[in-house]
């Protein structure tokens, strides 16, 4: 086995492990959600359409070219289009996680959200792991406009909410993207737990200090 083949096999196993962890801990249900990562050759490895994150076969993961061509494995999710848009427009993005996790999806369904940044920082980890979290308007799943909107937002952001749909998070590795996704989900949970209680938000100076 070549060095590249060994790296690819390791990444396949990592994807199935992380996906299974999401499923086992309740972040994903049924066949909802999808993950992807960039391979060293520039191709994309992604979870197949209709697949359960808790029961993936490393050898059946979808391999997709940078132009969207399906190369091998099972058929990719139609949502791979917006994964590709993120990779093309943010060179730091090496992996993408999209889930329908309970708290973040609930947050995406609320009216009156600030579309430029859904989560006003109230913990340091919001700033350190996510930064701003812009809201993409509702479109039917698979609609090309999701990819178009994410492409416009990708350069300056790494976490997003799709309205009435769920979260999308990037990372410089699949593990980092997974960690960022969990931080977003836990932050959304805190928002609902706090409810209408007065929140002590971070000041502009405190946010600047975290970003420095």
Please report, for each region that a protein language model flagged, where it lies by residue.
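Glycine-rich flexible loops
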Residues: 1-212
